[in-house]
From Swiss-Prot:
Belongs to the bacterial ribosomal protein bL25 family. CTC subfamily. GO terms for molecular function: 5S rRNA binding; structural constituent of ribosome. CDD domains: Ribosomal_L25_TL5_CTC. The gene is rplY. This is Large ribosomal subunit protein bL25. The keyword Transit peptide does not apply. It comes from Anaeromyxobacter dehalogenans (strain 2CP-C). One of its GO terms (biological process) is translation. One of its GO terms (cellular component) is cytosolic large ribosomal subunit. HAMAP family: Ribosomal_bL25_CTC. Part of the 50S ribosomal subunit; part of the 5S rRNA/L5/L18/L25 subcomplex. Contacts the 5S rRNA. Binds to the 5S rRNA independently of L5 and L18. Gene3D superfamilies: Ribosomal protein L25, beta domain, Ribosomal Protein L25, Chain P. It holds the Pfam family Ribosomal_TL5_C.
């Protein structure tokens, strides 16, 4: 891994006020952690930092930080940006020793076209990064996962991956990294039979929505039997 040189200056003032004044000067506050020393508070040019990590390693880029004549190896670990302007406001660095391994997150990249995708499956990446332990100058750019033989319903776990030379995976061995999911079938609703205009409702069925109820006192149709308990009209009144 190539090293990029980054210059910074020590800062003695801390807090929101001094940090604001630094940004007005075109610099940002930063902190260097790690090692056996107390954290070092520095100020640096954000544009220079962003340019320094324009490498395939991104955040895992090994940097040589020069602070007032002293030099130390660091990794860019964290940052804060303005939510509106997206400008870099603060940075954190991890000081490392070239002969001591470090743990970092390395991105996962799939290689090839899964056999299950050709069968209609959907390739899903469950772990977008894996924790790797390696010397600072041996940190890999990415973890490549060959998915060519992966069929529908199958998955690859961390235990099935080969770690890059000089690296160890520090991750759950049974963790699923990538899998091919079975596509979901769309449920088709059963067709609803349309009502036939003028058809009489089934016996005991309620009238259709919007149908008018018979008018009160309306006479039944000719020949119709009177309602139960009702009085017949137009017939004999019975023998005396």
């Amino acid at each position: 891994m190539a090293e990029n040189v980054l210059s910074a200056q020590k800062r003695t003032e801390q807090g929101k006020g001094p940090a604001r004044r630094l940004r007005q000067q075109g610099l940002i506050p930063a902190v260097v952690y790690g090692g056996k020393r107390e954290p070092t508070h520095v100020a640096l040019d954000p544009a220079t930092l962003l340019k320094a990590i324009e490498t395939p390693h991104k955040f895992n880029t090994l940097l040589e930080l020069q602070v007032e004549g002293a030099s130390k190896h660091v990794l860019f670990k964290d940052y804060t940006v303005d939510p509106v302007t997206r400008k870099l406001l603060h940075a954190d660095f991890l000081e490392v020793s070239m002969d001591q391994p470090v743990k970092v997150n390395v991105p996962v990249v799939t290689v090839g076209r899964a056999a299950g995708v050709a069968e209609g499956g959907i390739l899903s990446v469950a772990a977008h990064a894996i924790v790797v332990e390696a010397l600072p100058n041996k940190i890999p750019v990415r973890i490549e996962v060959d998915v060519t033989e992966l069929k529908i319903g199958r998955s690859l776990h961390v235990s099935e991956l080969k770690a890059p030379e000089g690296c160890k995976f520090k991750f759950q061995t049974d963790y699923v990294v990538v899998f091919v999911a079975v596509p979901e079938k769309e449920e088709v609703a059963a067709p609803v039979a349309a009502a036939v205009p003028g058809a009489a409702p089934a016996e005991g069925a309620a009238p259709a929505a919007g149908a008018a109820a018979p008018a009160a006192g309306a006479a039944p149709a000719a020949g119709a039997a009177p309602a139960k308990g009702g009085e017949a009209k137009g017939g004999d009144k019975g023998k005396k």
